[in-house]
């Protein structure tokens, strides 16, 4: 049995996990530790799903700070207090590079959050890392493969490693399906959320603009 199995954290929905953290049944630190362990076992090694481009080096520190704040005031926090969230790597995050999967942007540290990331943080979410994608959220050529990027390699379908994970928000869908986080952000112009969500048997939601 793997080390994360007994945690019973990685199979929970965001709502369930937020409720457990608020009620003191889990800590944010325990949730983050379990998910980082699972990423190391299944994304970096094992089947090497390659859904994650980078993890947040500050995640454990942030999780401990959240736990300490909630111990001092149990009523503290938003709807996602302490819940780990993954973000597609074409969405800016202040503490991690935003590469869009391209080697040209591996050092693209903007030092700021996209509006949607700032709103997640204000709701208490913990940004766990950045997910792989079809490079530039599109195909580089007519022979391009969904879910491949120069930075992250080919995102692999956890249900069948020989099948496509869809794209372009491949890493976000695979990461949720594999239990690396209960929720992840994607982007979509034409099918980039719904395609990988369908391939993973997940709900993919693209809100209307305006």
Summary of predicted features, one role per range:
Residues 2-106, 136-138:
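Short, well-ordered alpha-helical
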Residues 80-210:
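Short glycine/serine-rich loop/turn segments
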């Amino acid at each position: 049995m793997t080390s994360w199995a007994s945690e019973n954290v990685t199979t929970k929905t965001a709502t369930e996990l937020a409720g457990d953290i608020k009620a003191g049944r889990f800590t944010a630190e325990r949730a983050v530790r379990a998910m980082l362990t699972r990423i190391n076992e299944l994304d970096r090694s094992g089947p090497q799903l390659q859904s994650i481009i980078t993890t947040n080096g500050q995640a454990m520190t942030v999780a401990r700070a959240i736990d300490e704040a909630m111990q001092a005031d149990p009523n503290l926090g938003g709807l996602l207090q302490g819940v780990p969230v993954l973000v597609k790597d074409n969405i800016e995050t202040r503490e991690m590079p935003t590469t869009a999967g391209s080697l040209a942007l591996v050092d693209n540290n903007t030092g700021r959050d996209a509006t949607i990331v700032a709103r997640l943080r204000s709701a208490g979410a913990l940004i766990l890392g950045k997910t792989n994608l079809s490079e530039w959220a599109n195909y580089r050529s007519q022979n391009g493969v969904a879910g491949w990027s120069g930075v992250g390699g080919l995102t692999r379908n956890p249900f069948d490693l020989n099948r496509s994970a869809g794209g372009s928000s491949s890493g976000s869908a695979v990461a949720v399906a594999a239990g690396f986080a209960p929720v992840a952000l994607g982007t979509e112009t034409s099918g980039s959320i719904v395609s990988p969500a369908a391939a993973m048997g997940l709900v993919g939601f693209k809100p209307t603009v305006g």
